[in-house]
Structures are given as C-alpha cells and as structure tokens.
Amino acid sequence: ALVDRVLENNPGGIELRPMSKFPVLRDLVVDRSRMYRTLERVKAWIPVDGYGDRGAGPRESQASQEVRYPLSECMTCGCCVEACPQFAKVEILQRSGETDAEFTARQQQAYDESFLGAAAISQAMLFNDHPTGHMNADERLEALSGPGGVQVCGNAQNCVAVCPKSIPLTTSIARAGRQLTGYMFRRLFDR
C-alpha cells in the first residue's frame, strides 16, 4: 500500500540509494555505528545500580510525560542526520598493518570530534528531563558542549522536516541550548 502511494505520487518512478552520510556496507545497508557512538557520548540512558525491586519510581505530572513521550519515539533511523548539512560523512578506512583495536580507536576519535546530530541531542534532552535521569544531566551537558556539540547546529531545520516520527527535534536542540547556557553559568560561578 505504501509503495503504491509513493509510485502514485511519483509516476516517473523512484530511486533507492543508501544514505550518503554513513559508510556503505553493501547495497542499501550502511554502517550506522557513528549514531550509536553519539548516543554513548551523550550517555543516552539512565544508569541502574541493581536489578532488585526498588518500588515505585518518582511520580511526575502528565504534562511532563507528554513533553518527553515524542522524544522517546526515536528509532535511530538516521533520517535527521542524513538531511542535516552540518552532519558530514566521516568514513575512516583501516590502514595496512593497523590492528583492529587501533582502527577502532581512531574511528571513535573521529566520531567524537564530529557533530552529534539531532537524534543524540534529542535523546540527551529526553534523559535530562526524566526525574531519574536528571542526576546525570551535567555529564550529558558536558558532552553537548564539547567538540561537535550543540554549537555546531546551524538551525537548518531539515531534521524536523524529514523525521518519520515527527519528533520535535528543533525544540530539543533549543532546549539543549538553554540548558547549556545555565550549565555554563553554573560552572563559571561555582569555581
């Protein structure tokens, strides 16, 4: 049904190509490990210190839940970063004689210096606004203020236009900027 609708709107046919911002593995399959690395950089999770039953979690308002829910729908598809002019392709090839560990370290360093992208910024905001995740907000903000952080975003807003889940990515990026401003002032005056 979806293909029929796409072909109906494009009677001349459609062309399928792999994403251009990620290394191609084969055919239409791309290596999205860079996206997962950005999630690691911003610590897009809530650390747990055990698996035992700790009872009910912190209570929160319906309004707070409704703000965060759209951000939780991200499926890390990569459409937002594919459309982003600031998210440049980073393709590192293994040098001859280079061990797998050396190659991986060099690749991770290149990923860590490049723009995070809207998906990672949005996920950082999701967890910073979570009652339990808030305790690690400063670590996430530190990552967002580092190389390739929020300051690289040129506000082209292509990300929000192409997101298949209609996630308010530009709103998340703006919130990240506001949180970073407060964080930087706190760091400046807490010395």
Predicted regions and their residues:
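Hydrophobic/aromatic-rich structural module bridging two neighboring secondary-structure elements via a short loop
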Residues: A1-S20
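Ferredoxin-type iron-sulfur electron-transfer modules in oxidoreductases and energy-metabolism complexes
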Residues: L16-R191
